[in-house]
Design a protein with these regions (language model features):
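Structured surface patches comprising rigid loops and adjacent beta-strands/short helices at the edges
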Residues: 60-69
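Mixed-charge, Lys/Arg-rich low-complexity intrinsically disordered regions
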Residues: 2-17
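Small, basic N-terminal interaction modules of short regulatory proteins
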Residues: 17, 33-36, 68-70, 81
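Short helix/strand-capping turn motifs
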Residues: 68-166
C-alpha cells in the first residue's frame, strides 16, 4: 500500500485501504488528527478521502501515515520560568509525550525552549558591544521563537506542533 524510500512515503494506487491522519496542516476544519480515513483514490501528491462531514476531498500525502502507525500526543508540560513575570524572554519547557496504539503504553519526557525576539535582540546587542565577531544564534530543532512568552502562548505553540505531528521532532529527550 505504501512505497517508502528516501524517508518519503507514497501511497500506491493499486492497494487502497485506510490511512491515518497524522498532520492536519491547513485542514484543521476538515481533518482530525489520529482518525482513520478510507482511501478513495490517489495520485502522485494527494489522497482522496471522505471527511467526517461526508465531503469527498483531496489532501496532500504528507497529512497521512499508514493505518496502525502510532502517533505522539502531549500529556503534560511544565514551564521552567515564571513566564507571567515581566519580562520573560526565554524559558525551557519539559513535555510529557505519550504514544497511542502501543502496548504497553509508551511515554517519554522531553524538553524544548522558547525565546522572544527581544531575547535575540539582546544577544546580538551584547555581541556588538563586546566587539567580538557577530555569530548566529542557532536554535536547533528544539528551540522556537514566540512573540511573547506566557502560559497560554506556550500551550498554543505546543498544541500547534502536536497537530502538525512535529512535537516529538521539535523536542529532545531528557
Amino acid at each position: 500500500m505504501w512505497n517508502c524510500k528516501d524517508k518519503r512515503c507514497v501511497l500506491l494506487p493499486e492497494k487502497m485501504g485506510h490511512v491515518r491522519c497524522a498532520r492536519v496542516a491547513d485542514y484543521a476544519a476538515a481533518l482530525n488528527r489520529g482518525n482513520m480515513y478510507e482511501v478513495l483514490d490517489v495520485n502522485e501528491r494527494n489522497v482522496k478521502i471522505r471527511t467526517e462531514e461526508g465531503r469527498v476531498r483531496w489532501f496532500p500525502h504528507t497529512c497521512f501515515v499508514p493505518a496502525g502507525t502510532p502517533l505522539w500526543y502531549l500529556v503534560d508540560f511544565r514551564i521552567g520560568a515564571d513566564v507571567e513575570a515581566e519580562p520573560c524572554v526565554q524559558t525551557e519547557v519539559t513535555v510529557v509525550l505519550q504514544q497511542d496504539e502501543s502496548e504497553p503504553v509508551h511515554s517519554e519526557t522531553r524538553w524544548c525552549y522558547f525565546v522572544t525576539p527581544q531575547y535575540l535582540r539582546q544577544r546580538f546587542e551584547e555581541q556588538a558591544a563586546s566587539n567580538e565577531a557577530i555569530l548566529p544564534v542557532q536554535l536547533g530543532l528544539n528551540g522556537m521563537v514566540l512573540p511573547v512568552l506566557s502560559h497560554s502562548s506556550i500551550a498554543q505553540a505546543l498544541r500547534y506542533l502536536e497537530m502538525q505531528d512535529q512535537l516529538y521532532i521539535c523536542t529532545e529527550p531528557l
